[in-house]
Amino acid sequence: MGAPNHVNFVRRRIGLTGGIATGKSTVADYLRDRYQLPILDADRYAREVVAVGSPVLQVIRDRYGASILLADGQLDRQKLGSIIFADPAERQWLEQQTHPAIRACFERDLAQLESDPIVVLVIPLLFEAGLQDWVEQIWVVACPLEQQRDRLIHRDRLTPAAAEQRLAAQWPIAQKCEHADIVIDNSRDRTFTFQQVDQAIEKVVVAEN
């Protein structure tokens, strides 16, 4: 039975997380397009807080020099990634600069959505940043580690060693699944994935009288 394009929900926040390259964006896009749910994405905020002219970008430039910027003044994310994923201390420093600003973006936009019965917060580092209390339900998008590694290498054009550095910077996906309310298996095709999302949504839908 097909789900309606717009439904009424129990009022809650869903924390959508998973590992790098496991398919969080695929699920988030489906929730937005199929159910018209507001999606607040930490990765989008992470780009916003380092935009040209931002205080966070200036702090990063002060630490790493002008070579951390592209010719147009934007952050060279690839170069920064090669630094922070090779050195946990540098990654911790960067998170100390960016995480408060990202949280402020979430709080700003959540304040505009107070009347929405459900909001999806896409937070890749939900567990690592200790943000479980921000949400009422946690969904983890998962796939086997080998598949995750292959997707990451091909998506971001990384060497196997660089991919391993990025995987090591997050909780293992199996550990995240242990703490999930809902696990979405994204190891097969999108139809399989979306069927699970529909089933999960049914658990939070309030049947209309």
UniProtKB/Swiss-Prot annotation:
It is an enzyme of class 2 (transferase). It is found in: Cytoplasm. One of its GO terms (molecular function) is dephospho-CoA kinase activity. It catalyses: 3'-dephospho-CoA + ATP = ADP + CoA + H(+). This is Dephospho-CoA kinase. The gene is coaE. InterPro entries: Depp_CoAkinase, P-loop_NTPase. It comes from Synechococcus elongatus (strain ATCC 33912 / PCC 7942 / FACHB-805) (Anacystis nidulans R2). Signal peptide: none annotated. The keyword Manganese does not apply. Pathway: Cofactor biosynthesis; coenzyme A biosynthesis; CoA from (R)-pantothenate: step 5/5. ATP binds at A21, T22, G23, K24, S25, T26. Keywords: ATP-binding, Coenzyme A biosynthesis, Cytoplasm, Kinase, Nucleotide-binding, Transferase. Pfam families: CoaE. SUPFAM superfamilies: P-loop containing nucleoside triphosphate hydrolases. Belongs to the CoaE family. It comes from the Bacteria. Catalyzes the phosphorylation of the 3'-hydroxyl group of dephosphocoenzyme A to form coenzyme A.
